[in-house]
Design a protein with these regions (language model features):
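Non-heme di-metal
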Residues: 1-270
Length: 270
């Protein structure tokens, strides 16, 4: 039985912050989806400068977090190995809920469409997490059973002061890596006989194209507002914030569908 979604404030950005502070993964996921369902009943105060009342992000005691290179790699030939891989993906999706909620509450003074876009992203990430957790439970495991790393939130913290840097380096960089990584993961899980995992990853890939497109749209909007060239600015931001360099193979069709220009796609191989 899923926990009931916690009550949330009637103002969208305050509600997003309250959910980001929530430490229970299932309550966070359920609450985020409930917030999206109630979106037409919520007010929006885009001007208010909010302050967290608890450390961010709220998260459970487990999984234990460690550097990515210390997270054990397991064979997909075993159920435990498949569960470990699915747990790693679930952890990414849990962090993605936090990333979207943070983009929603943190930055004042943006158009209402920006906040609505990131609410949709948060709800879809919550759906992905729920699908993966349900599949994990079917394999005899749960979220928190394996160790994980914290790379996604690290970049979120680095860009906490600047929505332009956030749009450039979280959705357009870190989340775009998922577009490249998903098809090989689908092939591996398909070879291991996990058809349900392949189906879930297909849902995730479809939605993530839209999420990266939202990041592209608001990155370009913020560049236009500041009179900046989005293509020329990106490598400067990537170097300044020490963003990871994209690694091949690239899913060029998905990246194109997500709004990367031909010039940007050509630069991937430069």
């Amino acid at each position: 039985m899923q926990p009931a979604a916690p009550p949330h404030p009637a103002e969208l950005r305050r509600a997003a912050l309250a959910l980001l502070e929530q430490s229970d993964p299932q309550a966070k996921a359920c609450g985020t989806r409930a917030l999206f369902a109630a979106r037409d009943c919520l007010s929006l105060d885009a001007a208010v400068v909010l302050r967290p009342s608890a450390p961010l992000p709220g998260r459970p005691q487990r999984p234990l977090l460690m550097p990515a290179l210390r997270v054990p790699q397991r064979s997909l030939a075993t159920v435990k190995g498949r569960a470990a891989l699915l747990h790693a993906i679930a952890h990414i999706e849990f962090n993605a809920i936090n990333l979207a909620l943070d983009a929603l509450w943190r930055f004042p003074g943006l158009p209402s469409a920006y906040y609505r876009d990131w609410l949709q992203v948060a709800a879809e990430e919550a759906h992905h997490f729920t699908l993966l957790r349900e599949h994990l439970l079917g394999l005899g495991h749960d979220y928190g059973d394996f160790d994980a790393h914290d790379g996604l939130w690290t970049m979120t913290a680095r860009t906490a002061h600047d929505p332009l840097a956030r749009m450039a380096l979280v959705p357009r960089t870190l989340e775009a890596r998922g577009l490249d990584a998903t098809p090989p993961l689908q092939r591996k899980l398909g070879s291991a006989g996990d058809a349900r995992a392949v189906e879930i990853l297909e849902i995730i890939l479809r939605d993530e194209i839209g999420h990266v497109a939202i990041g592209n749209r608001w990155y370009r909007w913020l560049c236009h507002r500041g009179g900046l060239d989005p293509v020329a600015l990106y490598p400067e931001l990537a170097a300044r914030y020490e963003a990871p360099r994209p690694r091949p193979p690239f899913n060029l069709s998905a990246r194109e569908a997500a709004g990367f220009s031909a010039e940007e796609l050509a630069l991937l191989g430069a």
